[in-house]
Amino acid sequence: LSTGKIPDDCDTLIICTPKKDFDEIAANAIIDYINSGRNILWLNSAVTSEQNFPNVNKILALYGVKPFEIGIIRETDSSKMLQGSPDIIKPDALYSTITKDIAKDSGVRFINATKINLVSEEELENLKVNKTELLNASEKSYFRNNFKIQTDEISSSDVAGKFLVGAELEKTITEANEENGTKAVKSKMVIYGENNFTTDYPVSNYSQVTVFQLANNKDLVLNSIAY
């Protein structure tokens, strides 16, 4: 990205939880990449401190994604968590090209996940973005932004509800026009509110099992890249 151009043979650009803002050169390179009709896999873990990333947010905004909030998703439904750990959630997998086999099987597991906030349906339409929800945290989950609270039960400062944690966002760059032979140009962003599920992050301090090995996490990564 520092060269100002993403290689032509890069069909899917993977972005994992930016730790600092993109500079103008990198941001413009990504925008050019998007406008050429290529795809992004965006993996974002929970945000734990205030961030000022205008260029990162500018890229997300092209697909209707709002800036990530400070906080983490936790679960209260024992059937939607791993071994009594409310921070390791089992999101509901919705039927889609990426998740159809995962939805039929044992799903996926996310640790320290965050919610994906999108603009309104009307604003998505104005951006020419078509949304497909892939994964949702259950209706019994909650979003906690006060990390000093140690209890597993939902507190008065937590936000309860079902949260979007995986989505496919297809943006139309150029409309097809049969009269002049113009072909449609579209760019897809597949986005998840988690990135540890793609890594060797340990499930706990006492386990050699990694999050990547859980359930269908590996398949979700591969499907998202190949799609």
Spans of model-derived segments:
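Acidic, S/T/G-rich, low-cysteine, solvent-exposed domains in lumenal/extracellular/periplasmic regions
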Residues: 1-227
